[in-house]
A protein has these predicted regions:
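Alpha-helical interface subdomain recognition
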Residues: 1-252, 256, 261, 273-274, ...
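A short, Trp-centered hydrophobic/proline-enriched beta-strand micro-motif
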Residues: 289-297
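Short Gly/Pro-enriched turn/cap motifs at secondary-structure boundaries
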Residues: 301-304, 330-333, 349-350, 383-391
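Glycine-rich phosphate/pyrophosphate-binding beta-alpha loops
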Residues: 303, 329-334, 426-429, 541-542
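A structural signal for short hydrophobic beta-strand segments in well-ordered beta-sheet cores
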Residues: 311-315
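A short core secondary-structure module
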Residues: 320-377
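Flexible, small-/acidic-enriched active-site or ligand-binding loops
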Residues: 367-399
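Long, acidic (Asp/Glu-rich), low-complexity accessory segments flanking structured domains
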Residues: 395, 399-417
């Protein structure tokens, strides 16, 4: 890799035949997690093999813990396969080797001793009934070697030597993506560095919208039509491109990284469930950025239980329109949106997902002074800690009119099904945004550690500081590969809801840990609002 640090001292910290070692370790971890899966299946399913909802609710700690074990296993597998590909291409340099070794050492140790699901929740082997298997996993020679030798002080110091050079690159490691994706990353990295990063903190502190000038520039760069097929005015690129663009824009500011999400959701809904006329009419306008969509799903008393939504859409006697009445909340960027993907109940006889329909509801753009100029629509801003730049709102509908021809697909009762079909992409994109935030936290913490001097030297030279940064970089290696794997599965037409969920789960924890540790590196300055790390921590919580 260009710019990577090499040398005898660094190479001596790498376990011999590392790629073969981690491949064998990954297989051992997979077998270990498979036993855990079997134990959980016994506890969480009925005699006929179907999930036991009461047991799942009662044993949420166990079920969530199994999710974490599965996520670790998949992350290590995808990291091992990435390492093997790089080695075959002659690109598995010292930097990649050290970070991979550290990741395997730490995750294997956690799988045996306890995986942190968050700061106050840990899943341990005895809670899954796999104590003997944990002992056996530690006794596996390659796993034991990685745990004992893979993350020593000397190894961490060697990895730390590789980090300062990373500030001149977009990622610490060689990601393994092709030349086209490297060019896409370079383009959006430069845009984020030049046009977003210098202003992001001011936008955040003032709770300002991302300027329309920036939105229009993003449209010109193709952000809103990235994955829309060329026949509908888009670029026809895959979810890998979506990941790269989301990463880089989120590295600049999470708001800009998320701007394209609503377009992605709307476009995928229309591609999956829309009529030919709806595709022809809406997709080119979404792709060009002429129309900005917003997703209007969540309600105040339902939260994630979308099947119990109460907002009603009643068809007029003449069949020309629907009248929508109800309340929605946590709606992102609705004021400046032109189109709402609005989930509402069209069958009043139902109280579950079967009576829900998706409406493509047009609305005029508003302003801060007049946020919702449309008849039958009101709203109030929800002031938020972070994730600013688009603004969150509660919205009330009272006889709000939507043309009948804007019923997605022209058939009622398909809304929940259509929405669920978009969740794979949404989770992948959420993971990519979290990676961008984590990358920003890493770079911000690293730069501060190199600039700040205490006791006559850079604070980066203290292991308690540099070790935090090394672990950030190592976890970024793993979660990138997990996220890219999910994207490749989606691009290949394969079901990937499990892998996409894993990527989102891990990336969110990594983003928060990276931001928290980067703020700690800043010491007292991290608590000062003038320092961007204070914003990054708030944005990471989302």
């Amino acid at each position: 890799m260009d710019g990577a640090v090499e040398g005898p001292a660094l190479n001596s910290a790498i376990i011999p035949n590392l790629v073969a070692v981690i491949k064998d370790a990954s297989a051992a971890v997979d077998a270990y997690v498979d036993v855990a899966r079997g134990k959980c299946r016994e506890a969480l399913t009925k005699a006929d093999g179907r999930p036991d909802r009461a047991a799942l609710e009662r044993q949420q700690h166990m079920a969530h813990g199994l999710s974490w074990l599965g996520t670790y296993a998949e992350t290590l597998l995808q990291t091992a396969e990435w390492a093997a590909r790089l080695e075959q291409e002659g690109k598995f340099s010292t930097t990649e080797a050290l970070l991979t070794q550290i990741l395997f050492s730490e995750y294997c140790a956690q799988l045996i001793g306890g995986v942190p699901m968050n700061q106050g929740e840990v899943i341990r082997p005895h809670e899954l009934g796999i104590v003997a298997e944990a002992d056996a996993l530690f006794a596996t020679p390659v796993v034991q070697q990685l745990i004992i030798d893979g993350k020593t002080p000397a190894v961490m110091a060697a990895a730390a030597e590789c980090l300062p050079d990373a500030l001149s690159r977009n990622t610490v490691e060689e990601t393994g993506l092709d030349e086209t994706m490297s060019m896409v990353r370079e383009q959006f990295s430069k845009y984020a560095s030049d046009k977003i990063k210098p202003h992001a903190h001011e936008w955040h502190l003032n709770n300002e919208y991302i300027p329309m000038e920036v939105v229009n520039e993003m449209a010109e760069l193709g952000v809103f039509g990235l994955t829309i097929p060329e026949e509908f005015g888009g670029f026809g690129m895959g979810k890998i491109a979506m990941c790269v663009v989301s990463e880089e824009l989120s590295r600049g500011y999470i708001g800009t990284g998320s701007l394209g999400t609503r377009s992605e959701i709307a476009a995928e809904l229309i591609l999956i469930g829309g009529t030919d006329d709806q595709k022809t009419h809406w997709l080119p306008q979404i792709a060009s950025g002429e129309i900005l969509p917003t997703a209007v799903f969540t309600e105040p008393n339902t939260g994630s239980d979308l099947g119990s939504l109460r907002t009603r859409a009643v068809k007029s006697d003449d069949g020309s329109h629907y009248s929508v009445t109800g309340n929605k909340t946590w709606i992102t960027h609705p004021v400046r949106a032109d189109l709402m993907t609005l989930l509402a109940r069209t069958d009043p006889a139902t109280n579950n997902f079967s009576g829900l329909s998706m409406l493509l509801a047009e609305k005029p753009r508003g302003t801060d002074d007049a946020p919702f100029p449309a008849d039958g629509m009101t709203g109030g801003e929800i002031e938020v800690l972070g994730y600013r730049g688009m603004k969150e709102y509660e919205i009330g509908f009272d006889d709000f009119k939507v043309k009948s021809e804007n019923l997605l697909g022209g058939v009622e009762g398909q809304g929940f099904k259509h929405l669920m079909a978009t969740f794979e992409s949404a989770r992948i994109q959420t993971a990519a945004r979290a990676i961008g935030v984590a990358q920003n936290a890493f770079e911000t913490g690293l730069q501060y550690a190199l600039d700040r001097n205490q006791f006559g030297k850079q604070i980066f030279d203290f292991p308690r500081v540099s070790n935090k940064l090394v672990m950030m970089a190592a976890e970024l290696v793993g979660v990138r590969q997990l996220t890219y794997f999910s994207a490749r599965q989606k691009d290949g037409g394969k079901r990937c809801d499990l892998e996409a969920g894993m990527a989102k789960l891990l990336a969110a924890r990594i983003a928060w840990a990276a931001a928290d540790n980067a703020l700690q590196i800043h010491g007292g300055n991290g608590f000062a609002l003038e320092y961007p790390i204070s914003r990054i921590l708030q944005d990471a919580r989302i």
